[in-house]
Structures are given as structure tokens and as C-alpha cells.
Amino acid sequence: MSLRTSYSVRSSTSQVPVSQVSIKRTTNVPTYRAASIYGGAGGQGTRISSASYSGVRSGLGVPSMSSSIQVSASGSTGEIMGNEKMAMQNLNDRLASYLEKVRILEQANSKLELKIREALEKRGPDVHDYSRFQPIVDELRKKIFDATTNNARLVLQIDNARLAADDFRVKYESELSIRQGVEADITGLRKVIDDTNLNRMNLESEIEALKEELIFLKKNHDNEVMELRNQISQSGVQVDVDAPKGQDLSQIMEEIRAKYEKMALKNQEELKAWHESQITEVQVQVTQNTEALQGARSEVNELRRQIQTLEIELESQKNLKGSLEGTLRDTEMRYNMEIENLNTIILQLEAELTQLRGNIQHQTQEYEALLNIKMKLEAEIATYRRLLDGGDFKLQDALEEQKKVKVMTVTQTLVDGKVVSSSTETKERKL
């Protein structure tokens, strides 16, 4: 890594009142150079002394330093000299502090590189060990299981609350209908009471009218009696009649009065009895209607209770039906899977059986061929034996015997690779 730092200093002294001094530092690569600048009087004899130093750039992100410093001054030559000295001193101080920081950073960088090298040597090749995450995974699985259980419990509670709300709504509707029925009954009873009060008022008005009529009749009777008495007292004629003595007029009037009083009393008693009988009849009707209403109300309540019980039982039966249907679906699915597995096994066994049958048929054919060869060889051996024995032998017999071949067919039944039954069939044919 190359290190290079260049400094350029320009100084001009003339009679021009404005003088410019510029100091530039350009860092191209991470190489550091410490420099001190000394200026002569009036800006003449300016020189730069520099010392190079290594830059610091570690893998930890310490950036390389690059700076550009420019100092400009204007004024007379004395002012320029004073400003240059102050600027140079300031720059020297800043460069010294930068060098100290660089040295500290280099030491820290070397220490970090050493630690990194040691850590890499100790750690060796990268091996992914996830065993330390297993407890966390187990805990998270447990939390997920608990959350799922709580969710199911909450769903069950929500369903129970919904059923309870439905039950309360049914009860509320039944109570509301009962209340409406009672209000309708109360309205009807109020109408009956109003009709009864109206009848009572009519009867009372009739009683008052009869009383007034009775008073009016009594008054007319008294007036007629008084008029008759006045006429009798004013008339001076005495008439003697040879007739039996008539009844006393006052006695007749008393009798008439008593008769009318009895009639009025009788009418009053009859009216009172009729009124009481009407009231009693109305009360009996009201009592009967009330009892009938109470009976009908109790019957309605009982029917509503039965309806609620039947509705609850219906809901439970529906839930039971749903659970049984779900169980039936699961059972059918499981049985279908088992049937598919069994069908697969059956197909495999059928394929194996077909293969075994083919193998048996092939072996049977080979056995028949070997048996034919054996029989031919036995026939030839027998013929050769006859020839060797020197017995009676004809060429025609040998030819005929050679043309006859016995065929033996062996049939075996295999179950699970074992021979269950075996049968042998022998046939003789001519070649």
C-alpha cells in the first residue's frame, strides 16, 4: 500500500497591498505525512518539513482521513506575516493532534486484528449449532398450544353464551307475550267493570225515578184527599139515606196509602233484589272468566315451558347430530383411506401372484422340456441295454419306441410362497 502526501505552498511578496497564501494538502491513499511549515519575514524563505506515517484503516469501519486546508490573508506585509505565523502554528498543533490520534488508532487497530485472528483460530470452521434455540422453540410451541387451547375454550364459551342468550330471548318473548295477554285481559275486565258501573247507574237512575214517581203519587193523593175534605166541609147538604153506613173515607185513604206503600216497598225490594242478583251474576261471570283466564294462562305457561324444553332439546339434538355427522365423516374418511391402502396391497399381491404364475408356468415348461429329454434318454438307454444284452430286438420296435413320449404335468398351488397342494398329470404322445 503506497503512502503519499503532497503539500504545495505559494507565497508572493510585492508592493501589491493584497497578498494571498494558500496551503493545500491532498491525500490520495491512506498514507499520512506530518508536516510543519515555517515562514520567513514577509513570506520569503518559506519551507516545509514533513514526516510520513502509516494510515489507519481497519475492518471496523475507521475511515481514511483526507483534508484540504486553505489559508488566505489580505492586508499589508506585516499583517500577512503575523497571520501566516499564527496559521502555521495552528496547523502544526492540529497536525500534532492528528498524529496522536493516528497513533492511538493504529494501536487499537493492531489489537483488534490480533483479537480477530485469535478468535478465528479458536473458533475453527463454521458449524451451525441450533441446539441453543431448541428451548426457545419448545417454549414457543407450548405458547402456541396454550393459545390454541384458550382459543378453543373461548369459542366454546362464546357458543354457550350464545345458547344462553337465545334461551333468555325465548324466555323474554314468552314473558312479553304473557304480559300482553294479561294487559289484554285487564283491558277486557275494565270494559266489563265499566259496563257493570253503567248498568248500576242506570238502575240507580230508575230507582230515583220510581221514588220521585212515588212521591208525586203520594202528593197527588194527599191533594185529592184534601180537596174531597174541603168539598165535604163546604157543602151544607145532609142527605140521609136509608142504606147501610158507608166506609169511613179516611180509613179508605189509609188503606190506599198502605197499599201503595206496600207496593212501593215491594217494588223497591224487587228492584234491590234484581240489582243484587245482577251484580252477583256479573261477579260470578267475572270470577268464572278470571278462573278460566288463570287456567288458560297456566296452560299457556306450561305449553311455553314445554316448547322451551323441546327447543333446548332440539338444539342439543342438532348439536349431537352435527357431532355424529362429523364423526361419521371422519370414520368414512378413515375407512376410505384404509380401503385404498388395502386395494393397493391387493394390487401388489395380485401383481406378485401374476408374476409367480408366470414363473411357475415358465418353470413348468422347463420341467416338461427336461422331462421329455429325460424320457428320451431313458428310452435310448433302454434300447442300448437291449442291444448290449443281445435279446430279441427289431429295428421297427426301436423306431416305434423312440416315437412315443410321455408328458408329465405338475400343478402346484402356492399361498404366501408355500406349496399348499400339488397334482401330477402324465400324458403319452408320439413324436
Curated annotation (Swiss-Prot):
Q: Where is this region: Linker 1?
A: 120-136
In the record, Phosphothreonine modifications are located at 13
What residues correspond to the site Stutter?
Answer: 335
Q: Where is this region: Coil 1A?
A: 84-119
- Return the annotated region ranges for Linker 12: 229-252
Report whether Phosphoprotein shows up as a keyword of the record.
yes
Which BP terms does GO give this entry? intermediate filament cytoskeleton organization
Q: Where is this region: Tail?
A: 391-431
Q: Which PROSITE patterns match?
A: IF_ROD_1, IF_ROD_2
Keyword Coiled coil on entry = yes
The Gene Ontology CC terms held by the record are: cytoskeleton; keratin filament
Annotated region described as Head, given as residue ranges = 2-83
Positions bearing Phosphoserine: 12, 22, 36
Renumbered residue ranges of the record's region Coil 2: 253-390
How does it get modified after it is made? Proteolytically cleaved by caspases during epithelial cell apoptosis.
Gene Ontology molecular function terms on file: structural molecule activity
Site feature Cleavage, where = 242-243
Enumerate the residue ranges of region (Coil 1B): 137-228
* Superkingdom: Eukaryota
Instruction: Give the UniProt keywords, A-Z.
Output: Coiled coil, Intermediate filament, Keratin, Phosphoprotein
The family note in this entry says:
Belongs to the intermediate filament family.
Assembly and interactions?
Heterotetramer of two type I and two type II keratins. Keratin-18 associates with keratin-8.
Task: Provide the protein name.
Answer: Keratin, type I cytoskeletal 18
In its UniProt entry, the species of origin is given as Danio rerio
